[in-house]
């Protein structure tokens, strides 16, 4: 396998930061983003980004990630940080929940290598509706969270599979991180992860039989407001729209 940069090149690059992308290019004639995703998705939380340029035009890149370095699940009063070894730590949630993600990303000093795709790793996730309270404090916090969803959910990913549709190349990119380890260990760890991903991609897919079952419904749907209250709320929203205060509202 032709892995870049070489060990000697890496020793020079790591002097400019603490995170160097190590990569291997493969011909992508027998693999698609979906087939690759199906092979790596068992490695913990995953993501697949498809590039679309208007309508049905597919853009140049597809990005896949799995086996994140860290996972941040931020709730209103606490944050659960899960490491790659599945160990967990709970910390209080600051007034600005994004501060946790910003501090995490500030700990990395990535080394730029010319010719790399526009995305090779970082923070991938979502911001929930409830986050607006951290920006506009006049917006009240929901009194309940029945689904127990986090306000923020982010994967810190240092391993990314990049499909270059223009060149028909699949690039496996893993960052060598010098976070207290020596350069040789960091480089070898990244190379080993690349080799592990290659082995996953070379594993034949087995299609499993899936039988559909009728869902069991053991409850009766109940509304939380009456029809009269709902109609009144709709009329109020119409007034807001006519006044130019809103363009749409979710009731």
Annotate each PLM feature.
Residues 94:
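Active-site metal-coordination/substrate-binding segment of hydrolases
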Residues 1-41, 45-46, 51-91, 129-251:
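Extended accessory regions or peripheral subdomains of proteins
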Residues 102-116, 227-239:
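Short, hydrophobic/aliphatic alpha-helical segments
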